[in-house]
Amino acid sequence: MDSSKITFEYETAYELLVRLGADGLFLHTSLPTLNKVLELVPGKCYELDGDIGSGKTQLCYSLAAKLLLTKKTAKIGWISAVPLRTDHLSQHISSTDADETSHLLDRIVCKRVEMVSELRDSLNALCETINMQLVIVENIDAILHDTAYDREMGRNVQIDISERLRKLTRSGITVMVTNHITYWRGYPAPALGNFWASQIENRFFVERRSEESNVRSVSTMRGGNEKTIRVDFEISDGGLKAVV
């Protein structure tokens, strides 16, 4: 055999597992192209960072809908300062049966919180909920906004909350947090400051490509010398769409 004619094709660990039929080890959205970037592993904590209207919540809707459709007993915790828009989430569920959709939504445990103490109580309660597999904390900067201004007390609160998030992951629960971004010297950075940013290793940046376009993108920066990986998507009445 002429070894000079042997060719190799690079693939990530995620692509290898998918090729071997083990993609059930990951959490998915409705778009395979997004899943290749996110590579969401159960029992980890992730954060989506982006401006208002960038598509962070829509990504969470898609993730939640996919889990409800594929894991028949799984429960999802949804923590937010505003009520969950079940009508918007339902657009990501492919079923046209209203009763089936209602049954799926019944497996979402909603916690409306505005104060840190309520966030603590909600995280504790969800950690003890049977069959809880995913916890989404929407706009955590709205709940922890004061911690960005009080350096000592704020850091203690952020440590406490991040430890409670890790407690969820140690129980095998996946955590997805959404956070707004601020701009420092023209560069985007997660809200709540550098210390909070250091508490969550797995981050994704979600952005709208332009004001005139419905195209969004989600990207991640890998460690070391690896380049940023980005994929585009659109938001439609039926959920997320791939950009061809």
UniProtKB/Swiss-Prot annotation:
It is found in: Nucleus. GO terms for molecular function: ATP binding; ATP-dependent activity, acting on DNA; ATP-dependent DNA damage sensor activity; ATPase binding; single-stranded DNA binding. This is RAD51-like protein 1. It comes from the Eukaryota. The lineage of its organism: Eukaryota, Metazoa, Ecdysozoa, Nematoda, Chromadorea. It comes from Caenorhabditis briggsae. Keywords: DNA recombination, DNA-binding, Meiosis, Nucleus. Interacts with brc-2 and rad-51. Its main location: nucleus. GO terms for biological process: DNA recombinase assembly; DNA strand invasion; double-strand break repair via homologous recombination; reciprocal meiotic recombination; resolution of meiotic recombination intermediates; telomere maintenance. Gene3D superfamilies: P-loop containing nucleotide triphosphate hydrolases (3.40.50.300). Signal peptide: none annotated. GO terms for cellular component: microtubule organizing center; Rad51B-Rad51C-Rad51D-XRCC2 complex; replication fork. Has a role in the homologous recombination repair (HRR) of genomic DNA during meiosis. Required for rad-51 recruitment onto ssDNA gaps generated at stalled replication fork barriers.
